[in-house]
């Protein structure tokens, strides 16, 4: 099994380290040719945290947005953390247009405020158990469609969800030593 990691910005190296600990090979995807070259060998894709507006702009400039969107729309498993969650959202409250727009969620960017508003907590996550959660100016999911399964909440705010083969978190599981969510994603990839 091999997992692609969008490597335009953000914590892509940390996701690769998590996968390595699980014995899973990964490949960094930096441009369209790179994505096309590896796509048929991939079992899934991770969209890491970072700055969603910058990543969205790069995806468009590198002509990667539509091919990746088509793959996700056809059932290709994807795990979006923080900015990756925003990229997948059907609607972003502070923006006119979405990026991939494949997941039936409405997202509020930077809901957890500035860098100083970042925090760490632990909470239960369906299918995984109690896990550590590191929030860095994280978004929140303000509403979900009928087919979206809410996996975790913190202070009554949705911070993890799944719709079919799309898994998202507002927090950064790659910045902890807990492999549970990455294992959960690998299980999604195995049955996809």
From Swiss-Prot:
Q: Which parts of the sequence bind L-glutamine?
A: 50-52, 109, 136-137
**Would you say which domain of life the source belongs to?**
Bacteria
Question: What keywords tag this UniProt record?
Answer: Glutamine amidotransferase, Hydrolase, Lyase, Pyridoxal phosphate
Q: Could you provide one GO biological process annotation from this protein's UniProt record?
A: pyridoxal phosphate biosynthetic process
Q: In which pathway does it act?
A: Cofactor biosynthesis; pyridoxal 5'-phosphate biosynthesis
The record lists the catalysed reaction(s) as: aldehydo-D-ribose 5-phosphate + D-glyceraldehyde 3-phosphate + L-glutamine = pyridoxal 5'-phosphate + L-glutamate + phosphate + 3 H2O + H(+); L-glutamine + H2O = L-glutamate + NH4(+)
Q: What does this protein do?
A: Catalyzes the hydrolysis of glutamine to glutamate and ammonia as part of the biosynthesis of pyridoxal 5'-phosphate. The resulting ammonia molecule is channeled to the active site of PdxS.
Which PANTHER family does this chain map to?
PYRIDOXAL 5'-PHOSPHATE SYNTHASE SUBUNIT SNO (PTHR31559), PYRIDOXAL 5'-PHOSPHATE SYNTHASE SUBUNIT SNO1-RELATED (PTHR31559:SF0)
This protein is called: Pyridoxal 5'-phosphate synthase subunit PdxT
Q: What is the lineage of its organism?
A: Bacteria, Pseudomonadati, Pseudomonadota, Gammaproteobacteria, Pasteurellales
């Amino acid at each position: 099994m091999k997992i692609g990691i969008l490597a335009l910005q953000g914590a892509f190296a940390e996701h690769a380290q998590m996968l390595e600990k699980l014995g899973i090979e990964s490949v960094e995807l930096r441009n369209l040719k790179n994505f096309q070259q590896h796509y048929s060998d991939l079992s899934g894709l991770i969209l890491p945290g970072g700055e969603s507006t910058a990543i969205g702009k790069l995806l468009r400039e590198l002509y990667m947005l539509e091919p990746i969107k088509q793959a996700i729309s056809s059932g290709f498993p994807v795990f979006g953390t923080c900015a990756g969650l925003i990229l997948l959202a059907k609607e972003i409250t502070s923006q006119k247009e979405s990026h991939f727009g494949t997941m039936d969620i409405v997202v509020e960017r930077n809901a957890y405020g500035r860098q100083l508003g970042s925090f760490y907590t632990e909470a239960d996550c369906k299918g995984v158990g109690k896990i550590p959660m590191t929030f860095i100016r994280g978004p929140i999911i303000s509403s979900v469609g009928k087919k979206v399964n809410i996996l975790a909440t913190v202070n009554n705010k949705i911070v993890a969800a799944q719709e079919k083969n799309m898994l998202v978190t507002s927090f950064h599981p790659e910045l902890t030593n807990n492999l549970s969510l990455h294992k959960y994603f690998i299980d999604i990839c195995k049955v996809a």
